[in-house]
């Protein structure tokens, strides 16, 4: 799997909580050198509510929100189809910034100063 690539994924049929479920597109954010049978993805939605941690991008010609708050690691068996699209560098930078902000890594980086 390629970081920044978008694939169809099946997130199952969980009936509780607010987790995304069912078949949808997922953005791969794990590194390419990951030799495990899992991949870390961020689900996408064309109808989710906007939020500062849900960047808007265009995937396969459709306006799409990247649901940073729904990040998860799945078995590669749940990747159900072929490559749909790849995000541009600018779009990936926007996703990475939103992810860092959502996880509080920007504050951590600032508090550690230049020691990173």
Map each language-model feature to its residues:
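Conserved functional hotspots at enzyme active or ligand-binding sites that engage polyanionic ligands
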Residues: 1-116
């Amino acid at each position: 799997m390629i970081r920044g690539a978008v694939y169809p994924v099946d997130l199952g049929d969980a009936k509780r909580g607010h987790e995304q479920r069912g078949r949808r597109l997922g953005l791969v954010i794990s590194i390419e050198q990951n030799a495990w049978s899992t991949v870390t993805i961020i689900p996408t939605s064309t109808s989710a509510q906007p939020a500062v941690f849900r960047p808007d991008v265009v995937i396969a010609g459709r306006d799409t929100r990247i649901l940073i708050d729904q990040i998860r690691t799945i078995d590669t068996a749940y990747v159900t189809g072929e490559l749909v699209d790849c995000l541009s560098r600018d779009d990936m930078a926007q996703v990475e910034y939103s992810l860092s902000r959502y996880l509080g890594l920007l504050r951590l980086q600032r508090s550690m100063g230049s020691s990173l």
